[in-house]
């Protein structure tokens, strides 16, 4: 069944294949255009470098008027990532716009890895370490990077 959300997701997928952003990829699951698997590669010159972080993206029929639910499947130690993998990112909540597509969502999350917002923490321990003990923060991030090879 073709709906506006499904047609839009097909366009998003086509655009992602034709003009893939650096360091991110995503595709619908085999049998459901409304559920995607994605990968974000850790940005260079950050503690996340060399990591391969898996995510799921779940869309509703209200997409693109409502944002999808995006969750890390891989363990990520980050001030703006909840223990369950949920992501505290303004464009996925109150700053959402129907102009955002899957490519923009993934590149925004990749950018968040590079530039955390410790003032809006989803993980208070990570936020505190990011502000007060950067060496310990980076040590914990690197442990997640190593775990991402196994996941």
From Swiss-Prot:
Cellular compartments per GO CC: cytoplasm; HULC complex; nucleus
Pathway(s) per entry: Protein modification; protein ubiquitination
Biological processes annotated in GO: centrosome cycle; centrosome separation; DNA repair; endocytic recycling; heart development; negative regulation of apoptotic process; negative regulation of DNA damage response, signal transduction by p53 class mediator; negative regulation of ERK1 and ERK2 cascade
SMART domains, per database record: UBCc (SM00212)
CDD domains referenced in this protein's UniProt entry, alphabetically: UBCc_UBE2A_2B
EC number: 2.3.2.23
Domain UBC core, chain residue ranges per copy: 4-150
Source organism, top-level taxon: Eukaryota
Mutant phenotype after disruption: Lethality during the second instar-early third instar larval stages. Mutants show defective synaptic function as a consequence of mitochondrial failure.
PANTHER family: UBIQUITIN-CONJUGATING ENZYME E2
Function comment: E2 ubiquitin-conjugating enzyme that accepts ubiquitin from the ubiquitin-activating enzyme E1 and transfers it to a E3 ubiquitin-protein ligase. Required for postreplication repair of UV-damaged DNA. Involved in the negative regulation of the Ras/MAPK signaling pathway in the wing by acting with the putative E3 ligases poe, Kcmf1 and Ufd4 to mediate the ubiquitination and proteasomal degradation of rl/MAPK. Required for in mitophagy.
Record protein name field: Ubiquitin-conjugating enzyme E2-17 kDa
Annotated organism of origin: Drosophila melanogaster
Name of the gene encoding the protein in the UniProt record: Ubc6
């Amino acid at each position: 069944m073709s709906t506006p959300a499904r047609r839009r997701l097909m366009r998003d997928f086509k655009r992602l294949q034709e003009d893939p952003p650096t360091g991110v990829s995503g595709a619908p699951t085999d049998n459901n255009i409304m559920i995607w698997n994605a990968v974000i590669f850790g940005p260079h010159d950050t503690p996340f470098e060399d990591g391969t972080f898996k995510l799921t993206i779940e869309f509703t029929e209200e997409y693109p008027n409502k944002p999808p639910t995006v969750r890390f499947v891989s363990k990520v130690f980050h001030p703006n990532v909840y223990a369950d993998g949920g992501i505290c990112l303004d464009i996925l909540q109150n700053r959402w716009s129907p102009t955002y597509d899957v490519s923009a969502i993934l590149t925004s999350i990749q950018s968040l890895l590079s530039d955390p917002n410790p003032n809006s923490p989803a993980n208070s321990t990570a936020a505190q370490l990011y502000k007060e003990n950067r060496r310990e923060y980076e040590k914990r991030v690197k442990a997640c990077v190593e775990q991402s090879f196994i996941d």
